[in-house]
Amino acid sequence: MTADNKKTTALALFSGGLDSTLACRVVALQGIRVVAVKFVTPFFGYDLLQAEDEYIRKIKETSGIDVILKDVTPQYLELLKKPAHGFGKHFNPCIDCKIFLLSEAKKMMPEVGASFLVTGEVIGQRPMSQRRDALRVIERDSSCEGILVRPLCAKNLAPTQAELDGLIDR
C-alpha cells in the first residue's frame, strides 16, 4: 500500500550521518512529514549548540530535513553511572544510549505531532547495538514497540504497527 501521508508526521533520530539522513529521506519520499531530532551531550554534538540556527539552516539546505537540537546532558550523565547493558568499545554505553535516546524521542512525539519514530539503524552494522537481538531489546526497553520504524532494514524485520496501519509503506 502506498500511504497518502500528507497529515502523517514521523520523528526521526538524527545523527547527521549517512544512515539517519537516508532514513529521513526515504520516509519523506512517501509524503510523510519528517521532523528530526539531534540529541546533544558533551560527548556528541555539543558544539552545535553554539551555532544552533546555522546548523538547522545547513541541514535544511543540504538535506531538506527539519531538525531540532535537544541537549540531554544531565540525563545522559546519569545513564553513564551504571548502564544496564554495559559498555561497548571505547567506553560507549551503546544499547543503553539508544534506549535512552528513543525514550526521549518518544516523549517528544506529542510536541511535534508524530505518529511514529524513525532511525537509520541497519541490522548487523554495529557489533553491539545493531544485532537483531539488540534491536529487539532497544525497542522493548524504550517502550517503542510498534512505533519504531527502521526503514533501511524494514524488510528484514517484523512489520511495525505503523506499517500495519498504513502510515508508512515498508
Regions found by a protein language model. Name each.
Residues 1-170:
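ATP-dependent adenylation/nucleotidyltransferase module used to activate substrates
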